[in-house]
Amino acid sequence: MCIRDRLGIDDILRPDMTELCDDYIERVILPDGMQKIGRLCFYNCSRLSVLELPSDICDVDGDAFMNCTKLYMLVMRGSPKDKSCLKQILSQISTLVRVRWAVSDGNAIAQACFFEYDQTYDEIGPAHIFKLNMNGEGFRARQAFMDRVFVWKQYDEIFSEAIAQESEDDLLDMAFYRLIYAYELSKEARQQFLEYIVNHKKRLSELIIRKRDSGLLQSFLELKDDEENFIADVLAVTDMLALAAQDEWSEGSVILHRFKKENLSVSRKRRFEF
């Protein structure tokens, strides 16, 4: 499909064309060289789920993402070390959203999960003076920036508090992707994420099989603890095989059987006859 660089007024006003807005948009890829996302740019794009953009966009006007209730993934083309408008975007999205940084060939190098949060107001004075309350660790996660650069250490530090407030699935999302990409991941942060994964291995197994994503499955099977032991032990792999069979996911079953045979098989003891 070829799109012309320039459209005349007759093209724009054709009656058989539909305006590209609202719930017609599900995924948008913004080109390199863009400098600004204008006011109300994606207003009422209620089915927009994925937005890919260059990390060097420098400005985002207010309410650009109003009513984008299904936006769950931002893909930043560039390095997490780049200065970006990400904080401005996140400040306009209070629902759960993931951010993935990818290089030019599309390969991901880091991913973060920003939990949902909500705002409430308490009246504390007779002259309509209100106190703003932020509920949820998602707000704190969105403040993990310094000079427009995302600060991983600050982001990782919210996890211990988030355990008491956020759902198991969302916490597994945060922990799992931090371990997979391990971008600027300290030893202490890695330990806390590993501990959570080990204690919630069964649920993580269910989520991975449900997604039917061979890449995610392979990443999980490759995870090791500090003693170089696989996180996926015999019991976990056996449970996942049962789930894959139940879900009729043959590719996942093949990967699991191969991993079990190559890494978890107990060597047969020699038998001596006297």
Where are these regions (language model features)?
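Surface-exposed repetitive/solenoidal architectures
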Residues: G8, L185-R190, R212, R270-F274
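Hydrophobic/aromatic side-chain positions at a characteristic register within alpha-helices
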Residues: I208-R212, A245-E248
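Short low-complexity, flexible loop/linker segments enriched in glycine and/or proline
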Residues: M66-N67, Q88-S91, Q246, E251
